[in-house]
Amino acid sequence: VSLAPSGQWRIIALFFTHALAAGTIHTRIPDLQLQIGLSEAQLGLVLIGQPLGALSVFLFSSAIIERFGPRRVILWLLPLVVCTAALATLLLHPIAFFVLLAINGIGFSLSNIAVNVEADRVEAATGGRIMNTCHGAWSIGFLLTSLVGAVLRGLDVAPAIHLWGMAPLLIALLLWVALPMPAMPPRPHAGEKGSKLAIPTLATLG
């Protein structure tokens, strides 16, 4: 599958969209803390849910992306990130918040790996070097979504209005960017396939 250089903007825009979706909830965590009535210690425990969810799928991420393809993983799981953020404004309970953050972390982790795999495949197919540009676009997107959240907090816009208002816009943007993208072939790698599960070394464990 070939991709014209002019079409590389879609993968760059996908990184931007991913950052917009991933960052929406972060500026509203203080508001959700107040609405749920969490102490600082309780909030710290609840926030463990997101990295716990993200780490739980790392061992399986390669197999999942290989099985379904990065584009499909992105189209399925980035909306999950958006929807779990919005649902956190309705299910105002510590356990519900923890579970939603864990699911959010799973969606973020897999979609984040998937967009990077897709960018690598685009580079291999086109011979271009776009990874740095992609990560630059991601940084701009995360900064923008943080600024939007800060402005809306300053205007006393409720988290529910903010996150539910952003959800259809972000999903529509994702579909507009990602649906027309062709399925890129995997980058060819030399050598035999190794074990799909690597045992951590002492250096890895610290």
Model-based region annotation:
Residues 109-125:
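Intracellular juxtamembrane helix-capping segments at the cytosolic ends
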Residues 2-34, 102-103, 198-206:
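Pair of pore-lining "gating" transmembrane helices in MFS-fold secondary transporters
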Residues 161-179, 203-206:
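Symmetry-related core transmembrane helices of the 12-TM Major Facilitator Superfamily/SLC fold
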Residues 56-70, 153:
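Helix-to-loop junctions at the C-terminal end of transmembrane segments
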Residues 72-87, 167:
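Structural signature of the two symmetry-related core transmembrane helices
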Residues 15, 44-51:
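Short hydrophobic/aromatic, small-residue-rich stretches within specific transmembrane helices
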Residues 50-52, 139-144:
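Short hydrophobic/small-residue motifs within alpha-helical transmembrane segments
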Residues 89-100:
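Helix-loop junctions at membrane interfaces in 12-TM secondary transporters
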